[in-house]
Amino acid sequence: MITLTPGHLTLPQLRRIARESVQLQLDPASFAKIDAGAKAVADIAAKGEPAYGINTGFGRLASTHIPHDQLELLQKNLVLSHAVGVGEPMARSSVRLLMALKLSSLGRGHSGIRREVMDALITLFNADVLPLIPVKGSVGASGDLAPLAHMSAVLLGVGEVFIRGERASALDGLRVAGLAPLTLQAKEGLALLNGTQASTALALDNMFAIEDLYRTALVAGALSVDAAAGSVKPFDARIHELRGHRGQIDAAASYRELLEGSPINQSHRDCDKVQDPYSLRCQPQVMGACLDQMRHAADVLLVEANAVSDNPLIFPDTGEVLSGGNFHAEPVAFAADNLALAAAEIGALAERRIALLIDATLSGLPPFLVRDGGVNSGFMIAHVTAAALASENKTLAHPASVDSLPTSANQEDHVSMATFAARKLADIADNTKHILAIELLAAAQGVDLRAPHHTSPKLAPVMETIRSKVAHYELDHYFAPDIAVIAQLVGERAFAKIAPFSFASEQ
C-alpha cells in the first residue's frame, strides 16, 4: 500500500506504482483542503456570478454563461465530448501512473472536486479496474484533455475498462468495483480533464524503462571492452575529475568497478596498442552526458508529478478563482525530448561497439565473430538490424516540442506536443533494448573467443546469464530467437541489476 500525500510524491513511489501491483490510499491530512476547495466551488456556483469553468463554456466558448440548472449537464457533456482519443490503449503501467498523478493533483485542494469523486478513482485503481485510454489525441495543452476524458467517462459509466487485464464495459467495471455511475457537480468534469497527467505518466513510465536500459548499457559496454581487449585506463578517475561533469564521473566509476580484476584485461596490459576507438574509450563522456540529461528530466518530471496543472485554480482561503496556464505541458515536452536524445545515444553508442566487435581489424577477433567465416556469416546481419534500429531512433529523437498547431479556434494558439514527445519514448526504448541485446550477444561471443582468459568477477554473472539462454555461436542458425530471448532478459532488468549504479527512482 502506498499512501499518496498530494504534492509530496517520490520517484521510488512512482516507479512502484508503474511496476508493481501496489494499492493506493489518500493521506487523510489532505481531506480538509479537498473539502475546502469543493465548498468554495459550491459557494461560487450558488451565487451565480460568472466564473470560468464553473458556470461558463470552455475554450473559445468561455464567454457563454451557463444557467445553474444546467451545471451538471455541462460537466457531463464536457467529459463525453472530449473523449475523442484514437489509437491503441495506453499501457497498464502508464494508466496506473496517470490515475495516481491525477489524484495527487486533485488532492492539493485547488481544483474544487469532492472527495466522493476521488474515492471512486481510488476504488477503481485498487480493484484493478483501469480505464481504457486511447494513447493518441492530446497536444499537451489545454492539458491532456482527450486521454483524461476517457479516464473520467468511466466514472459516468461510459466507455471501456480493463478488469484485471480483461477488456470490458465501463458499467461492468463499476459493478466489479462496487460503484455506481457518478453525477459530476460544478467544475468537477473540468478538474478531471484539465492537467498534464497523461503526458507526465507516459514520460515517467518510459523514463523508468530508459533508466533500466542505461544500467544495462553500462554492463554491455564494459563487456564489450573485454571482448575487444580494450584498455581500462580511459576510465581512470583523475581524467574525469579534471572535466568535472557529475554524470561522466559516475559513469567512469561504474566502468572501473565492472572491469576490476578482469583476467582478459591483465593479459594485454603490456601490448603496443595506444588508444581504443571512441566507442570504447569515450563511454564515460557519452554515457555521462546521457546520465546528466536523464537526471535533469527526472527532476522536472517529479516537480510536474506533484504539480497542480488544473485551470482555473481555486483558492479557498480568499474565495478567488484564478485562470492561468499550468496545463501547458512544455516542461514535460522538453524533459521527454531530452530523454529521447539520451535513449537514442545509448543505442547509437552500443551499435558502434557492435560494429567494432565484428570488424577483425579493430577487435582482433575473427571476422563477424565466427571462426569458420565465409560459409558462416556470424553476426554480420545482426549488426545490420542494430544499425537499422539506431537509425530509426535518430528520426524518433527529433524534438516534438519544436512543433505547435493552434487549436480551439486559435484560443489555444500554442501547444506543447508533450504527449507525443512522451509517447514516442516507448519506441525508442524498445529499439534500444534490442540493440543492447545484440551487443550483449556479440560481447559474450567475443569474450568466449578470448579463452582461456575470462572476464571480470562482476561481469561473470552476465556471461552466465547469457549462456544459460543462448549457446556460443559455432555455426549459422536461425538467429532471431537468440536476440528475442536476450531482449526479454534486458526488459526484465536481468542485466541492469548487475550495474553498480542506481537512479533516484530505485532508492
Curated annotation (Swiss-Prot):
The keyword DNA repair does not apply. There is a cross-link at residues 141-143 (5-imidazolinone (Ala-Gly)). The modification 2,3-didehydroalanine (Ser) is found at residue 142. Belongs to the PAL/histidase family. It is an enzyme of class 4 (lyase). GO terms for cellular component: cytoplasm. Pathway: Amino-acid degradation; L-histidine degradation into L-glutamate; N-formimidoyl-L-glutamate from L-histidine: step 1/3. PROSITE patterns: PAL_HISTIDASE. This is Histidine ammonia-lyase.
